[in-house]
Amino acid sequence: YTRASDFVEQIAAESRKLLEKGEAYQTDQGIFLRIKQEEHGKLLGVDLEESLAQGTSEVDSGPKESPHDTLLWGPPIEGGKIWEFEGLPPGRPGWHLECTLMSSSELDLPIDIHWGGVDLIYPHHESEIILAEKIGLENYCDFWMHNGLMEDSEGKLSKSRGERITLEEVFTDCPPP
């Protein structure tokens, strides 16, 4: 199985390269990729401001130059693993670059179909596309597919919050015609 921890050194190296090229900047909250207006909107076909309005994921503005900038290398999390590499502050990988590097290393490029929930379009998948281009992975993916989300009266069901429903439960409550 592919493990994110096997890619931490590569994530650190790419973060450092982007920082050295001036494509990224460092704050006390990590290293962020600068995202320019013209680099954005490949999936949604809209500008940065419209992406925020159409995205279903929250974007943390934090200590960034722009709320659209992507975390490449984050600060340590209390109780979490901390990695140390030359040229980077002690910390942890950002998940957008992590996914870009893992998929490009494990799959033949271009990736035929990259799939995820609609909540991943922005900022995650938009960030993956931009990152792939910035690190030299032209023609990263041919097709992007996004499925809808299961919701109840309180919003999106989330496994990470312990909200799980089986098909058996769905069919008990809502039998097929």
Can you describe what each PLM-predicted range is?
Residues 10-177:
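Alpha-helical recognition segments enriched in aromatics with Gly/Pro capping
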Residues 1-6, 147-148:
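Acidic carboxylate-rich catalytic motifs and surrounding loops in phosphoryl-/glycosyl-chemistry enzymes
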